[in-house]
């Protein structure tokens, strides 16, 4: 776990999703379904499929699942931050947990249904990215960030001992 904050975002995202699974049994199903749809969508685009109806259908379903995934992650982060804020610093380090993701940021400012529509439109606009091997932004790219309040620095810049 001490290397969790030194590498890429995928292990942190998986770690967070496992925390969410513990409190929301449907989260595992949503993430699995999202990953399946994402792979299908990606493969269709890579193979040159241009069936707009099929792609749009996948994007809308991915957007619905993506918003639910982002909302569950946000809820878990909020609960953890509340718990951490109420614990003395000698029991648990004074840290701030955050999510760095497009969908999560949209949920800060818009109702979930509007975010779902915006996310589906974003997926549609990113179809070209797949063809050019660029990243596709969404809940599949969300990063789980930890900040050490005492030193006002991200966990990845803290010493290994501080990270533990």
Question: Can you describe what each PLM-predicted range is?
Answer:
Residues 53-164:
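Conserved NTPase motor "head" modules and their coupling/switch loops across ABC/AAA+ ATPases, GTPases
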Residues 45-49:
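Secondary-structure edge/capping motif, primarily at the C-terminal ends of alpha-helices
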Residues 25-29, 50, 72-75:
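Alpha-helical structural elements of signaling/regulatory helical domains
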Residues 1-43:
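Extended, charged alpha-helical "arm/stalk" segments used for dimerization and assembly
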Residues 2-5, 9-16, 51-55, 59, ...:
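Amphipathic, alpha-helical segments enriched in basic
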């Amino acid at each position: 776990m001490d290397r969790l904050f030194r590498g890429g975002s995928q292990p942190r995202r998986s770690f967070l999703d496992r925390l969410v699974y513990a409190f929301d049994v449907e989260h595992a199903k949503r993430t699995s379904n999202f990953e399946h749809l994402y792979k299908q969508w990606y493969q269709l685009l890579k193979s040159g499929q241009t069936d707009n109806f099929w792609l749009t259908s996948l994007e809308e379903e991915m957007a619905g699942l993506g918003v639910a995934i982002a909302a569950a992650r946000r809820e878990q982060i909020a609960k953890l931050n509340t718990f951490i804020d109420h614990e003395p610093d000698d029991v648990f380090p004074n840290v701030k947990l955050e999510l760095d993701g497009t969908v999560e940021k949209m949920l800060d400012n818009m109702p979930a249904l509007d975010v779902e529509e915006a996310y589906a439109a974003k997926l549609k606009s990113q179809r070209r990215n797949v063809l050019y091997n660029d990243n596709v932004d969404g809940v599949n790219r969300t990063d789980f960030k930890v900040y050490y309040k005492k030193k006002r620095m991200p966990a990845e810049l803290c010493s290994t001992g501080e990270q533990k």
